Regions:
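Bacterial Sec-dependent N-terminal signal peptides
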Residues: 1-24
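Extracellular glycan-interacting surfaces
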Residues: 22-187
Length: 187
């Protein structure tokens, strides 16, 4: 019996000893990944080395070196919404996005005036149901936002919005994209 206990102890020590040395000495980043799906990439038209991409785990990832390294935008500044991406404008400091509030479960439009370092809410005519935002990359003032049954337009950087479309039926105001062409806007 004593030999059996000794053999079991030696076997156990051998197995645990091997696992101690099988761990990597250091971790290496292999790119972005939030533990979930990544979606809605956006590339800065003024500086194509700068990009944002959202994750369904609420992180927003940001790179300024063409993806060689990524940082997470602070969760107290911007949380990812699966149908929204960061929108760039003609001024590299002014950007728009849709933010999410876990406590109220509201999705609302936000604006950055410092190149994405901080984000502040703008007027939200959707009452917390904003699912998409589109900004004119040749202007800082023209913004389109969509809820599930309405589409709104702002000509003053989100200070005020005008309802430009309402679907009271099935709630089908899904916007797949917006094309700004001078004074014309195609939705």
């Amino acid at each position: 019996m004593k030999q059996l206990v000794t053999a079991a102890l030696l076997l156990t020590l051998t197995l645990f000893n091997n696992t101690l040395f099988s761990q990597p000495l250091e971790w290496q980043s292999r790119g972005i990944g939030g533990g979930g799906a990544l979606f809605a990439p956006s590339v800065n038209p003024i500086n194509d080395a700068e990009m944002y991409i959202g994750c369904d785990m609420t992180e927003v990832f940001h790179t300024t070196n063409s993806g060689l390294s990524w940082n997470t935008v602070g969760f107290n500044e911007l949380l990812s919404v699966t149908t929204s991406k960061v929108q760039f404008t003609s001024d590299n400091l002014i950007r728009y996005a849709v933010n999410f509030d876990f406590f109220t479960e509201a999705s609302f439009p936000v604006k950055s005036t410092d190149g994405g370092n901080t984000w502040s809410p703008i007027t939200d005519p959707t009452g917390g149901e904003c699912y998409a935002i589109f900004a004119d990359d040749n202007s800082t003032q023209r913004v389109v936002i969509a809820s599930y049954n309405r589409i709104y337009f702002s000509s003053n950087g989100g200070t005020t919005f005008t309802n430009i479309y309402t679907n009271m039926g099935s709630g089908a105001a899904h916007v797949g994209g917006v094309f700004f062409d001078g004074t014309n806007i195609y939705i």
